């Protein structure tokens, strides 16, 4: 049985045997950490075609691509207060509040590093469709802010957790940028 609610629904409708005789393989139960890692891998920064193809770390356009990525990351996450700061204000549970405060303190250094790289990489390269890209990033920033400022139970802390999990990949991109710019992380 995968989900208790599914078993209840099957008993209520008399379909319990039909569910157990399904030709589809049963999903293996996974832990929360595995599910979150899977979501980050499939939908996070690392899933972007430029990241998967290595377009940010090698090739003739790598530095240009990195400059775009760094500037857009700075637009998304370089402001204060950011996702984690806003979510920390919403946290009422003592355990999540402590984690949020620690994460917000740590993110101060990450934001400073991001700003330092954005400054070192120079201006945003001029590209056809740049205005549309900036508008899309501004819309993403607004959506991220809405999640981080939400009063819905778990929404703000979920946004902070998602950013923290995805930051592992983002930090790799920042480290690659720092290396290419001869900066020390």
Show the residue positions of the predicted features.
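Generic low-polarity alpha-helical segments
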Residues: 1, 51, 56, 61, ...
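Acidic, low-complexity proline/glycine-rich segments
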Residues: 3-53, 131-136
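Short, charged, low-complexity loops and linkers
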Residues: 18-31, 55-67, 150-154, 182-185
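Exposed alpha-helical structural elements
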Residues: 22, 31-38, 50-51, 65, ...
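Alpha-helical bundle segments that constitute or directly flank the non-heme di-iron/ferroxidase center
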Residues: 40-46, 56-91, 109, 150, ...
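Active-site-proximal alpha-helical scaffolds that flank and shape metal-associated catalytic sites
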Residues: 95-185
């Amino acid at each position: 049985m995968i989900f208790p609610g599914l078993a209840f629904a099957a008993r209520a409708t008399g379909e319990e045997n039909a569910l157990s005789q399904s030709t589809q393989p049963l999903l293996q139960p996974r832990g929360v950490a595995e599910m979150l890692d899977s979501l980050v891998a499939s939908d996070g920064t690392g899933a972007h075609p430029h990241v998967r193809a290595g377009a940010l770390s090698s090739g003739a356009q790598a530095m240009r691509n990195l400059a775009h990525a760094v500037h857009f990351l700075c637009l998304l996450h370089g402001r204060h207060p950011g996702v984690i700061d806003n979510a920390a204000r919403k946290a009422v549970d003592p355990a999540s509040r402590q984690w949020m405060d620690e994460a917000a303190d740590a993110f101060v250094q990450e934001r400073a590093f991001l700003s330092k790289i954005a400054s070192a990489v120079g201006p945003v390269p001029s590209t056809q469709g740049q205005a549309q890209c900036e508008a899309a990033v501004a819309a993403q920033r607004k959506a991220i802010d809405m999640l981080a400022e939400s009063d819905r139970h778990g929404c703000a802390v979920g946004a902070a957790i998602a950013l923290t999990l995805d930051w592992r990949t983002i930090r790799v991109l920042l480290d690659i940028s720092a290396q290419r710019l001869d900066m020390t992380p």
